[in-house]
Amino acid sequence: METRRLGRLGHQSSVLIYGAASLGVVDQDRADASIQEALDAGINHFDVAADYGDAELRLGPRMGEIRDRIFLATKTGRRTYDEAWFEINRSLERLQTDRVDLIQMHAVCDLENLDLVTGKGGSLEAAIRAKEEGMVGAIGITGHTAEAPSVHREGLRRFDFDSVLTPLNYRLSTDPKYADDYAALVEAVKASDAALMTIKMIARRNWQEGEDHAYDTWYRPFDEQRYVTAATAWLLNGHPEITGLATAGETRLLQQMIVAERERADLSPEDAAAILDEVQDYASVFVDIPI
C-alpha cells in the first residue's frame, strides 16, 4: 500500500488510515479479525477516539503485539482541561500503552467549540501537558461539518497543530463555498507543514426516515465496489496534499476500501468524478447530521 509523509511528523503513513470507529460496537473476535485484515493489507496508521464506544478497549489487547508497528492516534472530545486530562489518561489505560503518537481535539466543528478548546482552561492545555510529559507525541484537530475546513484553518492560526483531520469527498468539492474553504485550509496546512487527513470519503447520503440501517455508520455509505473505487481514486489520485484517509466506521466495508486503494491506479480523478456523477442520490451528509 502507498505511504505518504505525515507532514512534519515524518511518519510514512499508509494512505488508508484504520478508522477504529468501526470497533465501537463489535465483539473482540470481530475486532481482532478486522485489525488483522488491516495489518495484512499494509495499513500502519490507526485512528481511534475516546468517544467511539468500546473501540479503545478492542484495540488495547492487541497493543502488546502491534504497538511498535503502527502510528497510533486517539482523540478527546472533552472541552475543559480537567475532563480532557482525565480522558487522555483513561485512553492510555484502555489502549494498554504508555504513549500515543497523536492526540486530537475531537469534533471541533464550529468556532464555539474551537473557543472552548483553545481558551484558558480548555482541553488543548491538557494535550500540551500530555505532550510535555511524553504521553503523546503530537497534537491535532478534527471535525466533521460543512464548516470544518474554515474552523480548522482558524485553529491553525491560533495554535500550531501537527495535524488536521477534515472531511473531503467528491460531492463536497462541488459546493463552491466548501471548495474555497478547503483550498484555503490546504494553503494553511502547507505553510505549517502539518499533516492533512480526511474523513467521509465514501459517505453517500444521510439515512432516510424508515430506511434499514444496514451498516454501523451514521450515514449511508457507498458499498458498491465501482463507486468505492471511484471515490478513492478521486481523492487519492487528485489530492497529493492528503496524507491519508480514514476508513469508514464499519468493519464490513474495510475490504472494499482496501481493494479500492489497490485498483485506483488507472483511474484518473476526472474519470472517477464521471462515475460518481452517475449516482442520483449522492449528497452531502452534513445537511442534517443525526449525531
What is each residue range found by the language model?
Residues M1-I70, A126:
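N-terminal binding-site loop/beta-alpha segment at the start of enzyme catalytic domains
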Residues L6, Y18, F46, L59, ...:
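Conserved, mostly hydrophobic/aromatic
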Residues G7-G10, D40, L59-D68, N89-D98, ...:
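Acidic (Asp/Glu)-rich catalytic clusters
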Residues S14-V15, R67-I70, D98-L102, G137-A138:
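Short acidic capping loops at alpha-helix termini that bridge into adjacent secondary structure
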Residues V26-A38, Y81-Q96, A146-L156, R226-W234:
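Short, acidic/polar
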Residues D54, V108-I291:
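Beta/alpha (TIM)-barrel catalytic core signal, keyed to glycine-rich beta->alpha loops juxtaposed to Asp/Glu
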Residues R69-T80, L102-H106, T166-Y170:
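A short, structured active-site edge motif that brings together acidic residues
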Residues L92-D115:
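Active-site groove signature of glycoside hydrolases
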